[in-house]
Design a protein with these regions (language model features):
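Sequence-level preference for short, compositionally simple segments enriched
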Residues: 22-342
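Bacterial Sec-dependent N-terminal signal peptides
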Residues: 1-25
């Protein structure tokens, strides 16, 4: 009974906040600046998030000036339509060092940044977990739907990016990702377009957990896969759950990719349900002669389905309204010449 009352109160507060914005939206702030030197509205990113109005009527933009922001941040689900714009990807860094097993932390609470607000956009930001090779340690946990990351970096080791949300869709464009074991994992539909992906140890790049009935899981389009010099045994992926779906299309693959390409996670039954595909990859690791027999080589006709519109509509006959991901085709956000404290 008490729990029911609690959820009713939370709902009422959310509705009240939303109605308040409708009545007088001009009273709310839609542009914030965070700066370590005190020249912005806030010194800490989480303080700026906490000051944002929920369910805004217009996108909220958070400009983040160069600096190392040593903090664990969370953008809740009711903070929709938020944009994080960094001053420069190399110098705008959000970092923390939690990991699974540290105190009461699990894999899913070890993140540096958790993004749950739908229609989130990030540009020119580094998300890092500096815990080191100590087990699962997320740089990013994103379960927001229609989230776009452009020109960002994701630094970590095991489980760098958790692409969460069974029905969520996420797009990474021109990003840099690094890690060791299963460093891109989760159940969402996520596209990595023209990204650079670096494997730091003998490991598995992906561990998809695609939901039953979904046509697409992780899709890599025109990416470059790198491997450190000591890496000699690298798999494209293994199925975290039985219906994992992952495709590498027109990607550059390093010599470290094992001939079979894919791993069944020690369970032959996964070979009957997982969907692993490739098309016109290149490089020393792209030879498909000895690929796992249960993996798929796409045809020219089949690869036509691998467009953003089709992927993000789950192959539906009626294409997804692509306004949320087409924004990447427009000119990048411009850092304001003067960002003054308001």
């Amino acid at each position: 009974m008490i729990r029911c009352i609690f959820f009713v109160l939370v709902f009422c507060l959310s509705v009240t906040a939303s109605l308040g914005q409708t009545a007088n939206p001009q009273q709310y702030k839609y542009v914030f600046t965070v700066a370590k030197d005190g020249s912005g509205d806030y010194r800490y990113i989480q303080d700026a998030i906490d000051a944002m109005r929920v369910f805004p009527l217009a996108p909220i933009t958070l400009y983040i000036k160069n600096g190392v922001y040593n903090e664990k941040i969370e953008l809740p689900a009711n903070n929709t339509d938020v944009r994080f714009i960094g001053e420069s990807v190399e110098k705008t860094i959000i970092t923390f060092n939690d990991y699974s097993g540290r105190g009461k932390h699990t894999t899913f609470t070890s993140y540096t940044a958790k993004i749950s607000g739908n229609r989130f956009v990030a540009e020119n930001i580094t998300f890092a977990n500096t815990a080191g090779p100590v087990g699962q340690a997320l740089a990013l946990y994103v379960d927001a739907d229609k989230a776009v990351f452009t020109n960002c970096r994701f630094l970590g080791n095991q489980d760098t990016i958790y692409a969460a949300g069974e029905n969520a869709r996420q797009l990474f464009v021109n990003c840099y990702l690094e890690g060791t074991t299963d460093f891109i994992f989760g159940p969402s539909t996520a596209v990595f377009q023209q990204c650079t992906i670096r494997a730091k140890s003998n490991s598995y790049i992906t561990a998809a957990n695609t939901t039953t009935g979904k046509k697409f899981g992780f899709v890599f389009l025109d990416c470059t896969i790198l491997a450190d010099s000591a890496v000699t045994k690298l798999y494209l992926g293994r199925p975290w759950r039985a219906f994992a779906k992952t495709a590498f299309i027109r990607c550059q693959l390093p010599k470290a990719i094992v001939p079979e390409g894919w791993h069944n996670w020690g369970n032959p039954e996964n070979e009957k349900t997982a969907y692993y595909a490739e098309y016109q990859n290149r490089g020393e690791g792209a030879n498909t002669k000895y690929r796992a027999s249960w993996a798929k080589q796409l045809t020219a006709k089949e690869v036509k389905d691998y467009t953003l519109e089709t992927i993000f509509s789950n192959g539906a006959q009626v294409p997804e309204d692509g306004a949320w991901f087409r924004q990447i085709e427009r000119k990048s956000f411009q850092w304001p010449q003067e960002t003054k404290k308001q």
